Every structure is written in C-alpha cells, then in structure tokens.
C-alpha cells in the first residue's frame, strides 16, 4: 500500500463513518413523522421479511402523520401489523382499506431530552470511529516508514489530522442540527 492509498482509504472510511452517524440520526424520532424512521421496518410478505420501502410508498400530509400506501393491497394487513410493532414510537395506526395512517403523539420534554442523550451517544460513537480510522491509518504509515521518507510520512500524518478534524466537525454539525430538531416544539 502506498502513502496516497493510505490517505485515500482513510478519507473514504471516515466519510462512510460520518454517513453512518447521519443515518443513525435519521432513525431517532423527532416531533415529526419521517419516512427514515421506517427504513429498517421489516414486513412479513409471502413468508419472507421484506423492507417496508419495497412494499409501499410513504408521504407526510402533516408533520406528525405518515401515510403508507402499499403497492399491493393484499399486503395492507401485514404492513399495519409491522407498523404497530415498531418499538419506542407509541403511535396510533389506522387502516382504511386503501392505506395505513400512522400518527405520532407529541413528544414530552422528558422524552425529547432522552432522545438528545441517545443522539449524543451516537455522535460520540461516530467520533470514536473516525479517530480509530486515523489510528489505523497511522499504523499503516508507520509500516511504510522504511520505504518512504520521514518528510512524506510527516506530511501525510498532518493531512490525516486535518481529515480527522474535518470529519469530527461534520459529526458535531449533524449533532447540533439533530439536537435543534429534537428540542423544537
């Protein structure tokens, strides 16, 4: 592996770590019904678990309401059953024969603060992941020290530090946005 490959690999993995954190943030409920909340919901469809997104379209007519319209009406009951069993949402689910209406209750102040703690934990996991990638990349650079000059290694280590700072700042920015979204009444 060359010095350039180590740097490119670190950049790629750090970017993926930040994206994973943002994806995790999407699964944390705010006061709004968001289709991202249901990305991991699996529906028992003809005997096999199928992601909800493959069976139905979702839209938000109102902030706390999500309408799920199945492509195949025979899946309506199974979709409703899967939505009723979504943990930590305590929502009302109604089926009118054409679509499933999913309404979230208002979040209490305590629940909002609890979600902020969860999001902060996920952000810290993301920052740790980015720092671990930096450490692994530095170890790879140390292995190359005999083949590459010390100046080149020092330059790339400096770039790694800048990359790490950029990506941890991206995690922090995403955290601030999510906290603002959560605490918004």
Swiss-Prot record:
GO MF annotation terms: ribosomal large subunit binding
Localization, UniProt: Cytoplasm
GO cellular component annotations of the record: cytoplasm
UniProt xrefs under InterPro entries: Ribosome_recyc_fac, Ribosome_recyc_fac_dom, RRF_sf
SUPFAM superfamilies xref list: Ribosome recycling factor, RRF
Keyword list, A-Z: Cytoplasm, Protein biosynthesis
Disulfide bonds: none
GO BP term, pick one: translational termination
Presence of the UniProt keyword Protein biosynthesis in the record: yes
HAMAP family, per database record: RRF
NCBIfam families per UniProt: frr
Family to which this protein belongs: Belongs to the RRF family.
Cited function: Responsible for the release of ribosomes from messenger RNA at the termination of protein biosynthesis. May increase the efficiency of translation by recycling ribosomes from one round of translation to another.
Protein name listed in UniProt: Ribosome-recycling factor
């Amino acid at each position: 592996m060359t010095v350039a490959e180590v740097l490119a690999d670190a950049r790629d993995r750090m970017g993926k770590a930040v994206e994973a954190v943002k994806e995790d943030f999407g699964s944390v409920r705010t006061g709004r019904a968001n289709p991202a909340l249901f990305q991991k919901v699996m529906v028992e469809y003809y005997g096999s678990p199928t992601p909800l997104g493959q069976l139905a379209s979702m839209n938000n007519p109102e902030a706390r309401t999500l309408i799920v319209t199945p492509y195949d009406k025979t899946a309506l009951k199974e979709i409703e059953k899967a939505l009723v069993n979504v943990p930590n949402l305590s929502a009302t689910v109604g089926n009118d024969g054409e679509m499933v209406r999913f309404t979230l209750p208002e979040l209490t102040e305590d629940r909002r603060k609890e979600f902020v703690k969860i999001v902060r934990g996920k952000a810290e996991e993301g920052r740790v992941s980015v720092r671990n990638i930096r450490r692994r990349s530095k170890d790879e650079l140390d292995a190359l020290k005999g083949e590459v000059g010390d100046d080149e290694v020092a330059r790339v280590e400096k770039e790694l530090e800048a990359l790490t700072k950029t990506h941890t700042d991206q995690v922090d920015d995403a955290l601030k946005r999510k906290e603002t979204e959560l605490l918004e009444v």
